[in-house]
């Protein structure tokens, strides 16, 4: 159990690290969609170090512009205007890095869920929801109409380059209760690894409460008897005879 706790702690630290790197990359991606030559120092553009008061790289290239010869990564020569939005190499790298971090984060969360599912040996646990990245006071659990709804919402604020940006992150998971579990008996807890466990005091039923016994083979109510050779009331053809039996009138 101690080894399992250490493993869960390491996975939780890795998830927090990936979340932090993902927020940083998202912030870089938001502010790298436009050229900041006249406002801020762009990592791939040296226009702020230009000897002229204004960025003249968008105009015809002159011999006096020595920085553009020294820095081939200056992208102002390839675009008509410096402030024109463009998909540069930094943006493509940021997008690829964000996708890689998302896949890595999803992989870590799946691993954590498998570990938690294997460690839950008691059958009174109805379900578990991973709410990594949310505080316990940001998680809400609602039980209504035979369903359990787990929701969480968080506000993120980024302070980048002197401006503030806000974004919201939320999650909502819903599942149905077994028919033998009462809504009033359902409890939840915020456990290790940022996982919300939904529990019930009684064991959930894996089969119907009153299973139907297999039906007994049906016997015919009135087994068929072999046909009588004739019916005294109605004329008939006796077995093996081509002539009908007629009543004799005396």
Swiss-Prot record:
Entries under InterPro entries matching the protein: A-crystallin/Hsp20_dom, HSP20-like_chaperone, ODF1_ACD, ODFP
Segments of this protein annotated with the region C-X-P repeat region: 209-238
GO cellular component, as recorded: centrosome; cytoplasm; manchette; nucleus; outer dense fiber; sperm flagellum
Sorted UniProt keywords: Cell projection, Cilium, Cytoplasm, Cytoskeleton, Developmental protein, Differentiation, Flagellum, Phosphoprotein, Repeat, Spermatogenesis
Compartments (UniProt record): Cell projection, Cilium, Flagellum; Cytoplasm, Cytoskeleton; Cytoplasm, Cytoskeleton, Microtubule organizing center, Centrosome
Keyword Phosphoprotein (UniProt): yes
GO biological process: cell differentiation; spermatogenesis
Span list, region 2 X 5 AA repeats of [RC]-C-L-C-D: 34-77
Xref: Gene3D superfamilies: 2.60.40.790
Sequence repeat placement: 34-38, 73-77
Residue numbers of Phosphoserine PTMs: 5, 10, 64, 86, 122-123, 151, 167, 189, 194
Disulfide bond entries: none
Main location: other
Tissue-by-tissue expression: Testis.
Oligomeric and partner information: Interacts (via leucine zipper motif) with TCP11 isoform 2 and isoform 3. Interacts with SPAG4. Interacts with KLC3. Interacts with CCDC42.
Function: Component of the outer dense fibers (ODF) of spermatozoa. ODF are filamentous structures located on the outside of the axoneme in the midpiece and principal piece of the mammalian sperm tail and may help to maintain the passive elastic structures and elastic recoil of the sperm tail.
Entry text on domains: The C-terminal contains many C-X-P repeats.
Name of this chain's protein: Outer dense fiber protein 1
Protein's organism: Homo sapiens
Originating gene: ODF1
């Amino acid at each position: 159990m101690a080894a399992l706790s250490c493993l869960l702690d390491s996975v939780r630290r890795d998830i927090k690290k990936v979340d932090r790197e993902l927020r940083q990359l998202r912030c870089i991606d938001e502010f790298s969609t436009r050229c900041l030559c006249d406002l801020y120092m762009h990592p791939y553009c040296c226009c702020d170090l230009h000897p002229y008061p204004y960025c003249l790289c968008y105009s015809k290239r002159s011999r006096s512009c020595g920085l553009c010869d020294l820095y081939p990564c200056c992208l102002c020569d390839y675009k008509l205007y410096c402030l024109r939005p463009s998909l540069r190499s930094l943006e493509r790298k940021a997008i690829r890095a964000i996708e890689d971090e998302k896949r890595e984060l999803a992989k870590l969360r799946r691993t954590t869920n498998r570990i938690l599912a294997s460690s839950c040996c008691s059958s009174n646990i109805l379900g578990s929801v991973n709410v990594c990245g949310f505080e316990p006071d940001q998680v809400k659990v609602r039980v209504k109409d035979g369903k359990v709804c787990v929701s969480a919402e968080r506000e993120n604020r980024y302070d980048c380059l002197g401006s503030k940006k806000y974004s919201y992150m939320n999650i909502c998971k819903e599942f149905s209760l077994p028919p033998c579990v009462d809504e009033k008996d359902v409890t939840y807890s915020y456990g290790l690894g940022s996982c919300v466990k939904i529990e019930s005091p009684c064991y959930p039923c894996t089969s119907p409460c009153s299973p139907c016994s297999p039906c007994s083979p049906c016997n015919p109510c009135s087994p068929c008897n072999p046909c009588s050779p004739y019916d005294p009331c109605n004329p008939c053809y006796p077995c093996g005879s081509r002539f009908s039996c007629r009543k004799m009138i005396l």
